[in-house]
Amino acid sequence: MKAGIHPEYREVLFHDVSNDFKFITRSTINTREKIEFEGTEYPLVKIEVSSESHPFYTGKHKIVDTAGRVDKFRKKFGTVGSKTQMAE
C-alpha cells in the first residue's frame, strides 16, 4: 500500500440522539467533536437513527418529522430549478 494516501481507520463513538444510545465502532469518518467515554476520548458522530431506535429493529412505530425537513428545504432553496422557472 502507498503511504500517506489512505484515511485514518480508528475507533469512533456514535451517539443516537433520539434515545441517548452510544456505541463504538471503527470508521474513517471525519469529525470535529470529541467525547470522553469510559475513560477514553473518541471522535463523536451524532446520528438520528440507529438499530436501537429504528422501527424495523424495535418493532415500535415512530413518527418521523419529514414535513419539517421539506419545509426547511423549501425555505432554504425556494423554487430554484422548478418547472415553471425553467419554462421562462
From Swiss-Prot:
Coiled coil: none annotated. Keywords: Ribonucleoprotein, Ribosomal protein. InterPro entries: Ribosomal_bL28/bL31-like_sf, Ribosomal_bL31, Ribosomal_bL31_B, Ribosomal_bL31_sf. It comes from the Bacteria. It holds the Pfam family Ribosomal_L31. GO terms for biological process: translation. PROSITE patterns: RIBOSOMAL_L31. GO terms for molecular function: structural constituent of ribosome. The keyword Ribosomal protein applies. One of its GO terms (cellular component) is ribosome. The keyword Ribosomal protein applies. Belongs to the bacterial ribosomal protein bL31 family. Type B subfamily. HAMAP family: Ribosomal_bL31_2. Part of the 50S ribosomal subunit. This is Large ribosomal subunit protein bL31B.
